[in-house]
Amino acid sequence: MNASASQQFTMPADPPRPPAAHSILDTPTSIPYSSGVDLFFTAVAAIMLYLHSLRDFAREVTQLGGSHLRQFLQRATANRFAGALTGAVSAAIVQSSSVVNFITMGLTEQKVLSMRAAWTVMIGANVGTTLTAWLIAHKFTGLGPIFVSVGGLWSLFGPRRWRTYGHPVFHFGLIFLALSLISSTLMPLAQTPEVLSWAGTLSTPLRALIFGAGLTMLVQSSSVVVGLTVLSVAGGLIEPELSIWVVVGANLGTGWVALFTSSSLGPIARRLSMFNAGLDLCGLALFVAVLQFAIRPLLALMPEPGLQVALVHSAFNLSAAAMALLLLPWIWSYLERFVPEEAK
């Protein structure tokens, strides 16, 4: 076939296509956001969601069962061990030792609980909050959408007289939904140069301790700090051994949160908060003197970094609580002398 014949069979060119329609979401912004900045703000938003969900859950549970919780605290403090168990169970239910401590201090001011019984409840509350770390470490965060769906639908379409019970279920699921979002953003965020540089500042136990205590005082919740620490370790952002000091600092910061909370209450509440802060300091001394040498054997018991943090967190709180409960009959009179009744 010659060239003239081949030209007769040439395919015509495609007509020009009209420009594609752009939505408002495709319009470039004037601020050039990088993927690292997007991840950072997503992580901050998830942390804020976690913090508010935790507080809302504690508020909903307290509003629904506050009177029952008060009766439970009043009846189940026959001895120091029963009081500690009561505090642990109460804090595990409401996911906040601060809420249990505040209710306990209020009951003591009203002469419903003795100051000694109230302190045993506060000792146990420190142990009860360790449940949060175990739930996160065991990846219960995947159940968040289920609880959010069930609680949300129940509060909207359930029987009218029972709809309020859907609110705490909704917020409980929202806690784990936020944790799941945090987990999904921390892993890629841990690879950015800015975060790697920041993580390098937590290179010593003292810095990690101060960071944990300061962050707890800022957000007013050790559960938030411990939960974030478990996720950070699982995502490779913090080394497991350094994360232990962040958790110890979070426990130390809880005592100072109780001190600030008690400033609006009477002298009995201030004495209790001082006792609680002293317990955290004694726990820190015990950890520095004894428990830090057992970190490596404890970490070896668990295969995953998140479970390792949860185990050491529980060991720290259980050791401090056991020490306080066993020595309570002998040290109580000295505590009352050391912190006078009209302490400011």
Predicted feature locations:
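Hydrophobic core segments of alpha-helical transmembrane domains in multi-pass membrane transport
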Residues: 42-55, 87, 91, 148-157, ...
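Short, positively charged and aromatic/hydrophobic N-terminal segments
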Residues: 24-27, 33
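Alpha-helical transmembrane segments and their lipid-water interface positions
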Residues: 59-62, 98-102, 129-136, 148-149, ...
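Alpha-helical transmembrane segments of multi-pass membrane proteins, especially transporters
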Residues: 67, 71, 75, 79, ...
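Membrane-spanning helices that line or support transport/gating and their immediate boundary helices
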Residues: 52, 56-64, 68, 72, ...
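Membrane-interfacial helix-loop connectors
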Residues: 91-94, 99-126, 136-143, 153-155, ...
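Helix-loop-helix hairpins and the membrane-proximal interhelical loops
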Residues: 31-80, 169-210, 214, 232
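Transmembrane alpha-helical segments and their short flanking loops
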Residues: 179, 186-201, 265-344
